[in-house]
Amino acid sequence: MWGLVVFLTPQYLSVFIFMHISTPGRICLFGEHQDYLGLPVIAAAISRRIHVQGEARSDQKIHINMPDIQSEETFFLEPDLKYTRARDYFKSAINVLRRDGYVFDRGFDVEVHGNIPINSGTSSSSALLVSWIHFLTHMATEKPKDTVTQFEIGRYAVAAEVLEFGEPGGMMDQFSTALGNIMYLESLPAPMALSYPVKLGKFVLGDSLEPKDTLGILKHVKFGMLDIIDILKKKDPSFELSTFPAQEAERFRSDLTAEQYKLLQGNLSDRDILREAKGMFETNQIDNQRIGELLNIHQDSL
């Protein structure tokens, strides 16, 4: 949603644009934590959103007000924006877009608000970044092209959130919030996303009020699984997580600790569960009871 306001002065025509962008959070239906490992995921947008609204200024100051968390941020459009804190996403988005040909000659007054639970695993940070990038692509003084697709916004968000800071995460959060709906994502060999126009039942999202331990999860799930893959490839160089039959995992039991073997079984099970669900989504022949069973199996293995 956007609006255009034109102000005339005796000396020149000055155009100020007011822009309002909103982006949904997401839940992962199938493949949770597997995008870290190059496997596909299926995610769904939720009805909780982040809103970014604002207008251009006459100078190069950017002021961002975040009343929900009683915070604000101010910086200026210098030629090379330096990061002053971890995950400095407001600046990284501008740097990424500039490298792709976007030009920003004026600053902005911006307000951010939303109702996605923070640090709860529903992609509040990615939804914020996607909204901010979408806002910036509209507000740029010069653009490499007239329109930008939702997929491209997702790609920019991956660059600004993950690649720019060397983060170990995957691509699900950025693409699922940028694309919305129910989305299937493959990250290898190159990002590819499909949107499924299927209707599922209602989901109830509960907030435990306990912060998500992102680094702890990554240490166990991603790096733990990468260690397992390294062990198995030394035993069998042909091993590939994407194709290895789950029923053959037993032959590696003696090569792994009990915890490693359980993690391997869980990843193989989650991979195959996603494939079954994907088949239903692609044909739009949804068996709600079976979807529920698959969701339960998936959650049990996490």
Residue ranges, per PLM feature:
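Short, well-structured alpha-helical segments that form the helix of a local strand-helix-strand
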Residues: 150-162, 288-296
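C-terminal nucleotide
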Residues: 14-28, 51-88, 98-99, 184-302
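ATP-binding N-lobe of GHMP and related small-molecule kinases
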Residues: 3, 14-126, 130-150, 164, ...
